[in-house]
Swiss-Prot record:
GO terms for biological process: cell wall organization; peptidoglycan biosynthetic process; regulation of cell shape. Mg(2+) 2 binds at residues 269, 271. Keywords: ATP-binding, Cell shape, Cell wall biogenesis/degradation, Cytoplasm, Ligase, Magnesium, Manganese, Metal-binding, Nucleotide-binding, Peptidoglycan synthesis. It is an enzyme of class 6 (ligase). Residues 102-302 form the ATP-grasp domain. The keyword Nucleotidyltransferase does not apply. GO terms for molecular function: ATP binding; D-alanine-D-alanine ligase activity; metal ion binding. It comes from the Bacteria. It comes from Rhizobium meliloti (strain 1021) (Ensifer meliloti). One of its GO terms (cellular component) is cytoplasm. The lineage of its organism: Bacteria, Pseudomonadati, Pseudomonadota, Alphaproteobacteria, Hyphomicrobiales. This is D-alanine--D-alanine ligase. NCBIfam families: D_ala_D_alaTIGR (TIGR01205), PRK01372.1 (NF002378).
Amino acid sequence: MSSKHVAVLLGGFSSERPVSLSSGTACADALEAEGYRVTRVDVGRDVAAVLQELRPDVVFNALHGPFGEDGTIQGILEYLEIPYTHSGVLASALAMDKDQAKHVAKAAGIPVAEALVMDRRSFGNQHPMKPPYVVKPVREGSSFGVVIVKEDQSHPPQVITSSEWRYGDRVMVERYIAGREFTCGVMGDVALGVTEIIPQGHAFYDYDSKYVKGGSKHVIPAQISPNIYQKIQTLALKAHQAIGCRGVSRSDFRFDDRGDGEGELIWLEINTQPGMTPTSLVPEMAQHAGLQFGEFLRWMVEDASCLR
């Protein structure tokens, strides 16, 4: 039993609120089972006042999306001097901005796809890059707003310039990498293993593939050559360290296998607030490495600190 009081931050007001509610509820339940005193905090604009009144020993950050994983809540927790899980202010802000994260990764020698950043409103009838390419919001998660432009499309999709677009005006246009999708979790200074993600009935690992039951198949350990498996783990740890992450992160990759066992391996992005239900990718990897869900969360709580 632990006498620690843990405030689990969940919900919030980003487009990823439903995801956060799932993660936060699962984490709160598991932490209670581990013996912690848990308070669930559905985050609103008054979160600083709520936490000042609660004065928990640790905050478990189960928020996703802007405010929860872009350095904002991390800055509030630093100001309040409450130890918290996951990455700190700078690493969170860097990782949330796909463009900045890509620059840091490239400088660290991590292979990335060619890309450019532009205002989505400047899209005309001309392709900004030779198709196929991917358009993704610079500051969104859960694959919100991701559009794949195929080779046979004569002009960019109108949805990008539509008034109904709600993912910010800065978008990244990135060369599309064919092939298989892999992901690797990092816990502290250890890579947890590599999972292959196989979307079921979807062109890529979109929102439904991630969160709808049966939307994707997770293969762990990934069935891939040992040298590529090890390379993915090495690059995931390298990205975690280059961006300055703490606690847990997850890096996503595409591998275009040319059939020679080598192929092209590309790092796509890093997630400092990966999904945290028992069947989410990183907890699955932790279990594969020998850590049950509750034990994994206990490690995260005991790893919590300020000045992250």
